[in-house]
Amino acid sequence: MTKKRKITFILNPKSGTTSKAEVPALIGQIIDKDLFDTEICFTEYRGHAAEIAKQKAEEGVDIVVAVGGDGTVNEVARSLVHTNTALGIVPCGSGNGLARHLCVPMDIKKAIGMINSCKIDSFDYGVINGMPFFCTCCMGFDAFISLKFAEAGKRGPITYVENVLKEGLKYKPETYEVSDDTGAKKYKAFLIACANASQYGNNAYIAPGATMKDGEMDVIIMEPFTALDAPQIAADLFMKTMHNNSKIKTFRTKTLHISRKQPGAIHYDGDPIMTDAEIDVHIEPQGIKILINPEAEEDAGQPNAVLNAFSDFFNNINNVREDIERQGHRIQVINKVLLRKLTKL
């Protein structure tokens, strides 16, 4: 007879936008009792999920499942790194970035049912100034918006977009010195993101080609842009074509050091904190075990034909806009020359 695995569900009643009232009953109905001895724990305060997960890993529990959003997932996951305890995810948050990257079903019943397959693999995770992250970490506008989002009374993509639209055109880009094993360069940037996984959440793909199994992070540097550029950037973000945007510079590295003029905000998996002017980021290869979807281990990150068509459409609009701007500049130059000649008559 196969020995049962021990599994603990850590449920955050307050995370995200999805009600979790029925989750305990669904766990009881769906989880295979011949395979698992099941326990359900509820978080009571910030950081409680990390404490519970650490305790369960020390007790030798086989799987700890985070039931909540990206914040809950990060709390649980960071307590399981470099242990034999695997992370499971039942996504109930407003973004669900890691769950989406790993193709965990967004339907709660299906996500719980997937656990019965018990397929586990090892993945990379990142560390920024000592804080583990599993999807992305960022500085600049992204971190600033994360602070605003955390302060907002409401959650969800609408609140996030409202903050982006309200603050985006007022935000002043910073200058950063970015160093990796190839040397150091200075950038004036709207934001800098380091991606272990492909997306922020809500299928917003900041690094469409990122994988959690290559031992490297995708670094995305977004240059300052105008209001006319914003629609193209937004389209690329959701169409998995961000890497094609002229305002984006990308590269891959194992370690990164970033210097800025003063301390400021960063975020790791959407959780904002204030930190020093000096920022260190690195990847820990194969440092966490995660329960995965047996039908799809990671999001391939490649746009389909429809998304490519939309991207081409927006790019064509962008090209027309740039032509108009160039023509407008030429007309302004011609007008100045004519004006100078007329004043001499």
Residue ranges and their predicted role:
Residues 1-64, 297, 307-319, 332-345:
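ATP/NTP phosphate-donor binding region
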Residues 10, 33-34, 82-86, 90-194:
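Catalytic core of DAGKc-family lipid kinases
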Residues 20, 221-345:
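ATP/nucleoside-binding phosphotransfer catalytic cores, i.e., glycine-rich phosphate-binding loops
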Residues 49, 71-76, 97:
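Short glycine/serine/threonine-rich phosphate/pyrophosphate-binding segments
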Residues 66-70:
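N-terminal glycine-rich "phosphate-gripper" loop used for MgATP/nucleotide binding
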Residues 131-137, 186-195, 200-201, 218-221, ...:
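Short hydrophobic-aromatic micro-motifs
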Residues 180-182, 188-253:
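Internal anion-binding site segments
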